[in-house]
C-alpha cells in the first residue's frame, strides 16, 4: 500500500540492560512500517524488531529473521530491513554472522569461559522467550527501532540539507517530511534518545520541533533521524500506483516521554515521578487521532497497528491524506514516440494547450469522497495579525489537522489553495486574522465563482475585528483551545453577509480644472463592514501616512493607540472636518438627505453594513419603538446611513449611537472637494467624485452558535438538569502562569470561594452576576459576629473572614480541555453555558489576587451557609434548604473563609471504618434496606461518612441494592462528596453501581441530585456505558440524553505533548 495509508513511527529505544528491560523494550516495538508494506510482510520481522531492542543479546539468535526478510521490502521505507544493516542486506548478514561467531567462540576456551558463555546463552534464551511471548507487539518490526551503529551508517555526500520549515507543494515533495521549527524548549529530551543522540553531552545545543508530529530533536540530529527513516505523518499519497486505492488512514504512532490525559486501553493516567526530565518512554500516541496508550504489552497491542485510524474528534473537518494525490509527471516512452501521431484540429490543440496551462505548476490534485457527515476545513492564517499570535495559531492547526489544509498567507495568497480545493463538497473556510484578511478571502471567492460558495468562519487576531464580533467570534483570540474552535466551526450556523459595490467616477458637475489633488479611486471597490468619510477617516489616514513615512516608530500596539488618540484630539482642535456637510450630497433610494446633513452639521457620515463599528461599538443602536427604522441586520439587503457630530462620536464609546438617517438599497454620493474616506479600515483622500453604492452579492459566513448542535435542546425538559450545584474556585495569575499546563497542580493551588446553585441553562454572563453577588454576601458576613457550621460536625467554630475581594478584571477559565486551562474572553461569556466549562466546579482567574498561602494546600471549605451565632438558621434543615434552592434557582452555600485553626478540615472528605455501635447499625441498615433503622441510628449520632469492608460508601451500597428511599435520605442528609465519590477498588461512583444494576429510579435520583455523568471508572467506562453493557439500552439512552455536553476527549482522548 502507499505511504498515506500506513504511518507507524516510533523512536529507537536504548539497548535493554538485562532481562528486566525486555518487557518495556518489547512493548515499545509496536509499530508498522512507513513505506509500502502488507501485514504478511510485517510478520516475518517479528524477531528482528524485538531483537533490535537489545542487539548485544539477540543479534546472533535473530539472524534468520533479519537477514531473510531484508529483501522482501521495497523502497526507502521498507519494514523488513535488518536492524544493523540499514538499507543494505549485507549489513544484516554481517551482524548475524558476528552473533553466530560469538556463540561458537567459547568452544575453544577453558571451563571458566564455558560457564560464562553458558550463562550468557541462558540470558539470551530468557530474553528470546520474553520476546516470543510478546509477539503481538514486537512483530511490527520497524528497522528504525534499533539504535544504528555509527560505523554502519553510510556517509552522506555533499553539503548538509537545510531542515524544511514550510510545506513543499512542488513535484519534488517527499511524503512524511517533517516541518522543523526553531524552539527553545529545554525540558524535552532529544527524540533519538541517549543511545543515538549526536550531541547528548551538549547542554545548550540548538533544537528543532516538528510542527506536525511534535517531536523535538537537536539540529545536529536531524540527519541521523533521516537515516533511521523516522517519518512524519503522511499528508498525501503518490499517484500512478496500480494498487487499489485505500480509503482509510492508518495510525501514526509516536513515542512520548511526557503525555497528558489517560490511556485509551486501561483508562489510567500517564503518571510518573519527575516527568519533566524523564528519559523513559511512557506512552505511544497517534499524531492523527491523538489516542494514547501506555508503553506496556497489556495496553498497546498488535491490532492497534493494523487498524484504520478514525482521525479523532475532528475527523469531520480533517482532509485525509488519501484525498490529496501527487500526480507524477508524464514521461514519453520510446514506443509512444515512435507511434504515428494523428492530425488534430486547431480547436482541439487550443483546448489541450489551455488545459496544460491550467495544470502547469500543479503537481497535486484533490479527489474527495463525498459524505454528508464531512465538512472539510481550509485554514488561512495571517501571521502578521495579532503580534505573534498568528504564528502560534498556524502551528496549532498543523498539529490538529492535515498540514496541507493549513495555509500561511504571508507565503502565498489564498487563490491557489481555493482553486485546488474548489471541488471538495461541504467545504468550510476559517480565516485567522483581521477583517481585512476576511475581505481578501471573500474577494478571491468572488473571483473564482465557486458554486456553492463555501462559508467562511473567523478567528479574530489583532484588534478591531468588528465582523468577527458580529458573527459571535469575539473581539480577539485569547487562548481558547484550538480543539474547541474546530468544533465551533464545524457546528456553526451558515448565515449570509451583504457585500456592497463602490463604483467611483469623477464628479460630472465640476470642470476638470477644478478637480483638486487626491486619488481617483478608492483602495477597495467592495466593502463588507462599512464605508465612511469625514473625521474618522481623517484620523486613520494620518496614522497610515505617518506609519509609511516612519515605520520604525510604529512597532508597538500601545504607541499606535496613543498616536490614534493624539491624532483624534488634534483633528478635534483644528476642526478639519467641520465643513463636511457643505461639500457632500447624499441621495438614498431617491431621497435627498443633504438638507438634514447640512442642518445637523455632521462631521462624519458612515454607511454601515454590520451592527459593529470602531472596535465593537454599535452606532445604529436599538431603534425600539421608532417605527421609521428597523433593527439592523447584515443579511437584509439594506445599508444603514448614520451621521455623527463630535458629541455623538464621543458618546459612541459609552453606549451612545449616531443620528439614524436612512435604511436603503442604493446610495448616490457626490463630493465637491477632496475628502478623507475609508473602506473597511483602508483610508485614502479621494478627489471630488460621484460614488454609487449598490448591493453586490451575499457571502456565506459561519456564525458561532451559542451552543453545540450535539448538545441537548434547551427546551427539552429531560435534557438539561433543573439546577447545577457548582463550587467556585479562584486562581492567581502567578499560579496560572506557572501551572496552566498541569491541571492537577493548578486545581490544588486554587482557593475555594463558595458554592453556587444555578439554573441548568445558565450562561457565564449570568453566572458572573451571581459570583459578584457571592462576593457581596461574603463582605456582609465578614462585618458581623459569625460562626461557621460544618456538615457532620456538631460544634461550630468562630472564624476570621477573608476580606480580599475579586478584582474587576477576573475572568472564567475553561477546565474541560484535556491538556490545560484556557481563559474565556469576557465579551464571549454570553456564548458559553456554565455546564460547558464545568465539571461540578468553576475556576476563575483573578490577575490582582494576592497569594496568602503556599500553593497546593488549600484549607477546607464549609458545605453550609454561615449562620448567626444567636440561633439556628433555616439553611441547617437539609430538606428546607433543598426546597429553597430549587425555588430560587440560585443559592449561595458557604462562602470560603480562612482560619489557621481549621486547615486540617479538608473539603475532600475521607471515609472511615465504623467505630461506634451507631455506625455499625447504619451500615447494616443500608445493606439490609431498612430505612427506619437508618433514620434512628443517624439521629443517635451515627455518621454517613463510613465505609464497608469492600471500601464502598453508604451511597454505593444503597445504589447497589436499589433502595430509592435510602438513596434519597443519604442525598438529603449526607455530605455532597458522597455523590461522586469513587470506589477505591473499581473506581465506580454510586451512579455506576445503579447503572450496572439497571435501576432506573435510583439513577434518576442521582442524576437529579447532580451526579456526574462523565466520570469514568478504572476501566474508562461512564455510567451510560455501564448501562449499555448491563443490557438496558433505555437507561443508557436516558443517561446519554442527560449529559451536560458532548465530551470530546473520552472517545479519542486528545492528549497534548
Curated annotation (Swiss-Prot):
Subunit structure: Interacts (via PDZ-binding motif) with DLG4; controls the localization of DGKI to the synapse. Interacts (via PDZ-binding motif) with DLG1. Interacts (via PDZ-binding motif) with DLG2. Interacts (via PDZ-binding motif) with DLG3. May interact with RASGRP3; involved in the regulation of RASGRP3 activity.
Cellular localisation: Cell projection, Axon; Cell projection, Dendrite; Presynapse; Postsynapse
Start and end residues of each stretch annotated as Disordered: 15-74, 334-358, 1014-1033
Any Pfam family hit: DAGK_cat
Listed Gene3D superfamilies: 2.60.200.40, 3.30.60.20, Ankyrin repeat-containing domain, Probable inorganic polyphosphate/atp-NAD kinase, domain 1
Gene (UniProt): DGKI
Entry comment describing in which tissues the protein is expressed: Specifically expressed in brain and retina. In brain, highly expressed in hippocampus, caudate nucleus, occipital pole, cerebral cortex, and cerebellum. Also detected in kidney.
Main localization, broad class: other
Keyword check for Repeat: yes
Major enzyme class: transferase
Name recorded for this polypeptide: Diacylglycerol kinase iota
PANTHER family associated with the record: DIACYLGLYCEROL KINASE, DIACYLGLYCEROL KINASE IOTA
Recorded family membership: Belongs to the eukaryotic diacylglycerol kinase family.
Biased composition (Basic and acidic residues): 1014-1024
Intervals holding ANK repeats: 950-979, 986-1015
GO CC terms in record: axon; cytoplasm; cytosol; dendritic spine; glutamatergic synapse; nucleus; plasma membrane; postsynaptic density
Amino acid at each position: 500500500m502507499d505511504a498515506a495509508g500506513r504511518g507507524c513511527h516510533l523512536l529507537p529505544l536504548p539497548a535493554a540492560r538485562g532481562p528486566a528491560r525486555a518487557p518495556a523494550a518489547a512493548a515499545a516495538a509496536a509499530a508498522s512500517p512507513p513505506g509500502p508494506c502488507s501485514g504478511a510482510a510485517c510478520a516475518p520481522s517479528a524477531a528482528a524488531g524485538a531483537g533490535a531492542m537489545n542487539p548485544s543479546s539477540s543479534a546472533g539468535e535473530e539472524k534468520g529473521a533479519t537477514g531473510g526478510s531484508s529483501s522482501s521490502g521495497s523502497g526507502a521505507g521498507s519494514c523488513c530491513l535488518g536492524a544493523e544493516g540499514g538499507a543494505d542486506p549485507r549489513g544484516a548478514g554481517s551482524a548475524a554472522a558476528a552473533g553466530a561467531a560469538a556463540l561458537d567462540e567459547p568452544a575453544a576456551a577453558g571451563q571458566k569461559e564455558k560457564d560464562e558463555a553458558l550463562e550468557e546463552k541462558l540470558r539470551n534464551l530468557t530474553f528470546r522467550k520474553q520476546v516470543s511471548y510478546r509477539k503481538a507487539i514486537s512483530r511490527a518490526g520497524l528497522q528504525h527501532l534499533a539504535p544504528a551503529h555509527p560505523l554502519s551508517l553510510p556517509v552522506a555526500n555533499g553539503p548538509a540539507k537545510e531542515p524544511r520549515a514550510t510545506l513543499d507543494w512542488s513535484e519534488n515533495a517527499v511524503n512524511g517530511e517533517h516541518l522543523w521549527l526553531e524552539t527553545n524548549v529545554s525540558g524535552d529530551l532529544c527524540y533519538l534518545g541517549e543511545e543515538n543522540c549526536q550531541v547528548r553531552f551538549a547542554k545548550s545545543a540548538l533544537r528543532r520541533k516538528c510542527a506536525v508530529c511534535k517531536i523535538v530533536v537537536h539540529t545536529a540530529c536531524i540527519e541521523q533521524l533521516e537515516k533511521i527513516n523516522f517519518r512524519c505523518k503522511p499528508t498525501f499519497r503518490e499517484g500512478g500506483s496500480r494498487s487499489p486505492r485505500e480509503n482509510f488512514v492508518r495510525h501514526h504512532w509516536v513515542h512520548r516521554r511526557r503525555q497528558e490525559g489517560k490511556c485509551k486501553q486501561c483508562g489510567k493516567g500517564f503518571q510518573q515521578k519527575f516527568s519533566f526530565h524523564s528519559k523513559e518512554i511512557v506512552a505511544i500516541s497517534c499524531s492523527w487521532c491523538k489516542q494514547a496508550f501506555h508503553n506496556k504489552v497489556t495496553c498497546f497491542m498488535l491490532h492497534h497497528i493494523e487498524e484504520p485510524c478514525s482521525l479523532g474528534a475532528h475527523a469531520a473537518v480533517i482532509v485525509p491524506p488519501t484525498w490529496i494525490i501527487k500526480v507524477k509527471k508524464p514521461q514519453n516512452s520510446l514506443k509512444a514516440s515512435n507511434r504515428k501521431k494523428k492530425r488534430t484540429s486547431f480547436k482541439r490543440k487550443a483546448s489541450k494547450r489551455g488545459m496544460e496551462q491550467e495544470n502547469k505548476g500543479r503537481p497535486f490534485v484533490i479527489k474527495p469522497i463525498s459524505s454528508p457527515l464531512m465538512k472539510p476545513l481550509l485554514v488561512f492564517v495571517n501571521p502578521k495579525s495579532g503580534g505573534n499570535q498568528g504564528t502560534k495559531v498556524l502551528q496549532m492547526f498543523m498539529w490538529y489537522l492535515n498540514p496541507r489544509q493549513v495555509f500561511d498567507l504571508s507565503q502565498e495568497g489564498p487563490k491557489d489553495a481555493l482553486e485546488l480545493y474548489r471541488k471538495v463538497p461541504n467545504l468550510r473556510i476559517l480565516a485567522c486574522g483581521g477583517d481585512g484578511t476576511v475581505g481578501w478571502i471573500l474577494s478571491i471567492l468572488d473571483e473564482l465563482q465557486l458554486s456553492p460558495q463555501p462559508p467562511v468562519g473567523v478567528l479574530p487576531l489583532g484588534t478591531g475585528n468588528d465582523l468577527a464580533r458580529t458573527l459571535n467570534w469575539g473581539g480577539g483570540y485569547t487562548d481558547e483551545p484550538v480543539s474547541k474552535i474546530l468544533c465551533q466551526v464545524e457546528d456553526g450556523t451558515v448565515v449570509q453577509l451583504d457585500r456592497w459595490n463602490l463604483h467611483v467616477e469623477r464628479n460630472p458637475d465640476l470642470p476638470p480644472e477644478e478637480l483638486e489633488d487626491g486619488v481617483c479611486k478608492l483602495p477597495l471597490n467592495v466593502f463588507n463592514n462599512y464605508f465612511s468619510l469625514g473625521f474618522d477617516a481623517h484620523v486613520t489616514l494620518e496614522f497610515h501616512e505617518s506609519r509609511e513615512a516612519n515605520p520604525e516608530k510604529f512597532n508597538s500596539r500601545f504607541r499606535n493607540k496613543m498616536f490614534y488618540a493624539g491624532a483624534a484630539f488634534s483633528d478635534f482642535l483644528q476642526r478639519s472636518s467641520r465643513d463636511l456637510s457643505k461639500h457632500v450630497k447624499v441621495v438614498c433610494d431617491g431621497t435627498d438627505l443633504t438638507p438634514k446633513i447640512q442642518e445637523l452639521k455632521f462631521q462624519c457620515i458612515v454607511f454601515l453594513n454590520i451592527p459593529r463599528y470602531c472596535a465593537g461599538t454599535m452606532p445604529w443602536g436599538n431603534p425600539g419603538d421608532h417605527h421609521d427604522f428597523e433593527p439592523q441586520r447584515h443579511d437584509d439587503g439594506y445599508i444603514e446611513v448614520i451621521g455623527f457630530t463630535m458629541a455623538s462620536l464621543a458618546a459612541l464609546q459609552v453606549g451612545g449611537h449616531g443620528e439614524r438617517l436612512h435604511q436603503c438599497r442604493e446610495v448616490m454620493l457626490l463630493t465637491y472637494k477632496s475628502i478623507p474616506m475609508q473602506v473597511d479600515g483602508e483610508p485614502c483622500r479621494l478627489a471630488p467624485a460621484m460614488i454609487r453604492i449598490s448591493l453586490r452579492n451575499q457571502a456565506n459566513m459561519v456564525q458561532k452558535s451559542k451552543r453545540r448542535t450535539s448538545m441537548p435542546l434547551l427546551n427539552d425538559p429531560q435534557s438539561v438538569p433543573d439546577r447545577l450545584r457548582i463550587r467556585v474556585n479562584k486562581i492567581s495569575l502567578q499560579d496560572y502562569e506557572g501551572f496552566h499546563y498541569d491541571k492537577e497542580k493548578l486545581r490544588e493551588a486554587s482557593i475555594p470561594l463558595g458554592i453556587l446553585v444555578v439554573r441548568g441553562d445558565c450562561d457565564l454572563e449570568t453566572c458572573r452576576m451571581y459570583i459578584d453577588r457571592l462576593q457581596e454576601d461574603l463582605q456582609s458576613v465578614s462585618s458581623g459576629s459569625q460562626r461557621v457550621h460544618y456538615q457532620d460536625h456538631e460544634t461550630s467554630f468562630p472564624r476570621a473572614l477573608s476580606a480580599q475581594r475579586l478584582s474587576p478584571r477576573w475572568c472564567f477559565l475553561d477546565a474541560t480541555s484535556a491538556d490545560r486551562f484556557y481563559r474565556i474572553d469576557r465579551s464571549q461569556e454570553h456564548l458559553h453555558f456554565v455546564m460547558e466549562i464545568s465539571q461540578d466546579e468553576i475556576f476563575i482567574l483573578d490577575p490582582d489576587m494576592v497569594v496568602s498561602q503556599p500553593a497546593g494546600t488549600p484549607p477546607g471549605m464549609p458545605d453550609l451557609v454561615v449562620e448567626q451565632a444567636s440561633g439556628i438558621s433555616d439553611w441547617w434543615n437539609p430538606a428546607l434548604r433543598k426546597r429553597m434552592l430549587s425555588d430560587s434557582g440560585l443559592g449561595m452555600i458557604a462562602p470560603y473563609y480562612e482560619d489557621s485553626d481549621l486547615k486540617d478540615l479538608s473539603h475532600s472528605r475521607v471515609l472511615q471504618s465504623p467505630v461506634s455501635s451507631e455506625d455499625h447499625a447504619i451500615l447494616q441498615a443500608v445493606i439490609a434496606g431498612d430505612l427506619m433503622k437508618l433514620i434512628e441510628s443517624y439521629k443517635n449520632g451515627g455518621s454517613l461518612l463510613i465505609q464497608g469492608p469492600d471500601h464502598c460508601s453508604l451511597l454505593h451500597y444503597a445504589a447497589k441494592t436499589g433502595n430509592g428511599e435510602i438513596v434519597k435520605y443519604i442525598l438529603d442528609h449526607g455530605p455532597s462528596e458522597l455523590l461522586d465519590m469513587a470506589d477505591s477498588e473499581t473506581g465506580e461512583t454510586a451512579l455506576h453501581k445503579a447503572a450496572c444494576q439497571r435501576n432506573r429510579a435510583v439513577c434518576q435520583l442521582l442524576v437529579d441530585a447532580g451526579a456526574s455523568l462523565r466520570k469514568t471508572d478504572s476501566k474508562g467506562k461512564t455510567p451510560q456505558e455501564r448501562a449499555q453493557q448491563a443490557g438496558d439500552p433505555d437507561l443508557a439512552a436516558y443517561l446519554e440524553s442527560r449529559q451536560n455536553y458532548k465530551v470530546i476527549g473520552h472517545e479519542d482522548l486528545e492528549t497534548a505533548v
